[in-house]
Curated annotation (Swiss-Prot):
Family of the protein in this entry: Belongs to the ATG8 family.
Annotated keywords: Autophagy, Cytoplasmic vesicle, Lipoprotein, Membrane, Vacuole
Protein name: Autophagy-related protein 8
GO cellular component: autophagosome membrane; Cvt vesicle membrane
Entry keyword Methyltransferase: no
GO biological process terms held by the UniProt record: autophagy
CDD domains, A to Z: Ubl_ATG8
Post-translational modification, as annotated: The C-terminal Ser-117 and Ile-118 residues of ATG8 are removed by ATG4 to expose Gly-116 at the C-terminus. This Gly-116 forms then a thioester bond with ATG7 (E1-like activating enzyme) before being transferred to ATG3 (the specific E2 conjugating enzyme), in order to be finally amidated with phosphatidylethanolamine. This lipid modification anchors ATG8 to membranes and can be reversed by ATG4, releasing soluble ATG8.
Reported phenotype of the disruption mutant: Blocks autophagy. Leads to reduced conidial germination under starvation. Especially, leads to reduced CP15 levels in conidia. Also exhibits enhanced sensitivity to oxidative stress. Impairs growth of the mycelia on host cadavers and considerably weakens virulence.
Organism annotation: Beauveria bassiana (strain ARSEF 2860)
Amino acid sequence: MRSKFKDEHPFEKRKAEAERIRQKYADRIPVICEKVEKSDIATIDKKKYLVPSDLTVGQFVYVIRKRIKLSPEKAIFIFVDEVLPPTAALMSSIYEEHKDEDGFLYITYSGENTFGSI
């Protein structure tokens, strides 16, 4: 999936911003979170997050649910490189495995399991 954030910001600018963030906040992970294009789930109010490195994927999903005001009975799926990451995985390990060459971790979310699991 193509990232709107990548389309709107040139690579050099994104890379410089991610480096600045990592220097200033060494224990945090720069994350870009965007909705899967064709999903009918609500659009999130902000794309950029500074996530504590010891946060789990499940805790991050909880943050996203709150930001889009998703009711408890509705499902949400998050994807990294079009794969569902394990809920118990630490964001720091996901970042190390999947960070983009610009230094950001790109996460997409959807109301349906559009890609499948590992």
